[in-house]
Amino acid sequence: MASQTNKELFVGGLARILKEQRQVDVRLKAGDSDQKGVSISAHKLVLSARSEVFKMILETEEIKATTTLDTITLSELKHTELVALVE
């Protein structure tokens, strides 16, 4: 049986904590999500590492200064697009 590499273990661990909604620190809401509570939980660190746009959004003073779970609305995205982006 082949053993997993450190990279595979790390990526698998990240996927697991996202799926289990553990230690999330931001919620994302699409522009077409007009219902309250329709948001996607995510991790700021992962979003920032994968996207320069998210990095810029998450480094604004408004987001950095808050101590609560932020919800960021991305009005130009549809919910299905946002789900695909986060996964």
UniProtKB/Swiss-Prot annotation:
Taxonomic lineage: Eukaryota, Viridiplantae, Streptophyta, Embryophyta, Tracheophyta
Protein source organism: Arabidopsis thaliana
Name of this protein: Putative BTB/POZ domain-containing protein At3g29740
InterPro entries tied to this protein: At1g01640-like, BTB/POZ_dom, SKP1/BTB/POZ_sf
Keywords: Ubl conjugation pathway
UniProt keyword Glycoprotein, yes or no: no
Span of domain BTB: 24-87
Organism domain of life: Eukaryota
Record's keyword annotation contains Transcription: no
UniProt free text on domains: The BTB/POZ domain mediates the interaction with some component of ubiquitin ligase complexes.
Disulphide bridges, residue numbers: none
Swiss-Prot/TrEMBL GO biological process terms: protein ubiquitination
Pathway(s) annotated for this protein in UniProt: Protein modification; protein ubiquitination
Protein purpose: May act as a substrate-specific adapter of an E3 ubiquitin-protein ligase complex (CUL3-RBX1-BTB) which mediates the ubiquitination and subsequent proteasomal degradation of target proteins.
Name of one Pfam family that matches: BTB
Signal peptide (residue range): none
